[in-house]
């Protein structure tokens, strides 16, 4: 048997068995809370490195990206179980996904732009054919260079909701203004968001 690594289907990085197992676990966690009808698909660039920052993690820590997404959706975490929080997110027709479904391995960090560019067409196809949301809401500024073509915005098969002309930047440096703007955009997009 060969020890050669093959590219991961979810991110394009060379993948170990552990890498594949982690990707499949995260897909399973997300699929459990996938709405039947997706009002807004929140599209992030790169899956967080820590499970605590991954929205659908059963740990329910909701730090990092997960916490910012819940804050923007107006979902309180006070005195609620992890499942109750994720069910509320699901009932509102919200789904969070990533162009790169796996965290960037430290050895491949310099290639993140190339990996995003290579994986983006497959993500768009998945949005159009599988997710079929009413709205796509990009939530990472890393997606800005990928959202436009010579003829305009990329084809997602639905409306793209932007923060002006750019993606909402919910990366680690997100401001309260950005989170508030995203909440307003979700409300204006007729997604059930509570203040």
Task: Describe the role of every protein-language-model region.
Residues 1, 166, 173, 191-195:
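Intrinsically disordered, charged low-complexity linkers and terminal tails
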Residues 2-160, 165:
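A polyanion-binding, active-site-adjacent surface
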